[in-house]
Design a protein with these regions (language model features):
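Intrinsic low-complexity, disordered N-terminal segments enriched in polar/charged/small residues
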Residues: 7-9, 29
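Hydrophobic alpha-helical signal peptides and transmembrane signal-/tail-anchor segments
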Residues: 27-31, 38, 43-46
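Short, Lys/Arg-enriched N-terminal segments with co-localized hydrophobic residues
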Residues: 55-74
Length: 370
């Protein structure tokens, strides 16, 4: 658009552009207009008048300004998360759905074909769901279903003591959403993969679908969730600190150094400096974020990159207050894991430590013991 146009011609040009865009799109787009048009008061007021009407609805705006044309559509409004027609595992376990026809989606974890009857095990985010295929009843051909395919299954929920979680779905239909291009390179349906670390990493998107492999991420989630929930309950404020800096927060030479637009920079070892700064603002702060340490090592107890759970608190009487807060976190989180992550604990075969009473020993006493 030529901004040298006089005000009246410019307004006509803008009106024409708005009409064209209203006829083809669901909203108003002024991206193509140069900033120079704001120098013309009439054009600016017209744009302002148009923009002020957008929240009130597309139709009112069109009528007021005489905008019309074929192909116009009413502006659609997004009102939030839609209720899904498909059920999750937690929904299937409810008493009221037993005997009801339901829809579930998921990935085919494995198929056990017994002839006239087959068990199609679906893998969902909450765990495994057993589906029962009956030849001549289920309404589809089992040969069309492949392991690792994603499907939408329809069937009747029934109790079954031998099925995972005590329920199964007696299939009435199945819609294939996607199919694998080739057989899976790893036996992900096995309890343990029993393959090399190299193979697991080479096929990481596949190996992580194994129940034991993915359970570790759920435990990690529980630890971080417990940290956040507990500290929120204790009046802490969550902060987010920079990870690229000019200097380290803790000092030392073990830093990952990088070029930051031709200036030297480092990856932060710790948010300590920022935590101390924000204690003066909120009294109690915490952060869950990655930290980086350029330390060569040959043990499993050292990591160059990990997720650090940091908190800082003011107005304390001594370090014992910090120890008490840490103990409170451990107690809260271990109970959370036992309650909300029991399946993952069982799959991994781990035992949650008891945290009711944690011994507190002085450093000089520890040195004598070792």
């Amino acid at each position: 658009m030529d901004i040298a146009l006089d005000e009246s011609k410019l307004k006509v040009q803008i009106e024409f552009s708005v009409r064209v865009q209203c006829g083809w799109y669901r909203g108003f787009y002024f991206d193509n207009f140069r900033p120079g048009i704001l120098k013309y008061p009439g054009a600016f007021l017209f744009l302002r008048d148009i923009a002020s009407e957008i929240p009130q609805g597309y139709t009112r705006c069109r009528k007021k300004h005489g905008i019309s044309g074929k192909g116009e559509r009413k502006m659609e409004l997004v009102k939030g998360v839609k209720k899904s027609e498909t059920l999750e595992l937690a929904d299937l376990l409810k008493e009221e759905v037993k005997g009801q026809t339901v829809k579930v989606n998921g990935a085919v974890h494995t198929i056990r074909d017994m002839g006239t009857v087959a068990f199609v095990i679906l893998r969902k985010r909450g765990g495994l769901v057993q589906c029962v295929y009956e030849k001549g009843v289920s309404g589809f051909d089992l040969k069309d279903v492949k392991e690792a395919a994603t499907v939408e299954a329809t069937g009747v929920v029934a109790e079954s003591e031998k099925a995972p979680h005590g329920i199964e779905i007696r299939l009435r239909g199945m819609r294939i959403l996607s199919e694998p291009a080739a057989p899976m390179p790893l036996p992900i349906a096995k309890w343990k993969l029993n393959t090399s670390l190299e193979a697991k990493l080479n096929y990481r998107p596949i190996s992580l679908r194994n129940l034991r492999e993915r359970a570790r991420f759920r435990i990690q989630e529980g630890l971080v969730r417990g940290f956040r929930d507990f500290l929120y309950g204790e009046g802490f404020t969550e902060i987010h600190t920079p990870k690229i800096g000019a200097k380290s927060a803790e000092g030392g030479a073990n830093l990952f150094r990088l070029d930051y637009f031709h200036r030297p920079a480092i990856l932060q070892q710790s948010p300590q400096f920022y935590k101390q700064m924000m204690v003066g603002v909120f009294d109690r702060v915490f952060e869950t974020a990655p930290v980086f340490r350029a330390e060569k090592h040959n043990t499993k107890r050292h990591l160059n990159e990990y997720t650090s759970l940091d908190f800082e608190m003011g107005y304390i009487d001594g370090f014992e207050d910090v120890m008490a807060m840490e103990t409170g976190y451990l107690q809260y989180t271990m109970k959370l894991l036992e309650k909300e992550y029991a399946d993952e604990i069982r799959i991994l075969g781990i035992e949650i430590p008891k945290t009711e009473d944690i011994p507190a020993v002085r450093f000089d006493e520890i040195k004598k013991l070792v």
